[in-house]
Amino acid sequence: MNGVKRQITVPKFVSFKQQGHRISMLTAYDYLSAKILDEANIEAILVGDTVGMVFQGHETTLPVTLDDIIYHAEIVGRAVHHAL
């Protein structure tokens, strides 16, 4: 990159695939982690059901509800300005 951050979009992802570009994707469940990943030019941030094991202390992901995922996705969404 030339120092200018551009927002990653779904069409941009398609373009990356067509060009053989590797996509960087990491997981975040909280504002600070998502902000750091966004500032590090990570192209996609995943919020997944592993939040149940990582943040909630469950032994599996089965107890995670849709409301849990929505809650963490909203937090991550507030932190991210460039990543998808």
Where are each of the predicted segments found?
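N-terminal amphipathic alpha-helix/helix-capping segment at the start of soluble metabolic enzymes
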Residues: 1-27
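Hydrophobic faces of well-ordered beta-strands that scaffold small-molecule active sites
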Residues: 24-27, 45-47, 84
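Alpha-helix-loop-beta-strand connector modules within alpha/beta enzyme cores
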Residues: 8-11, 58-84
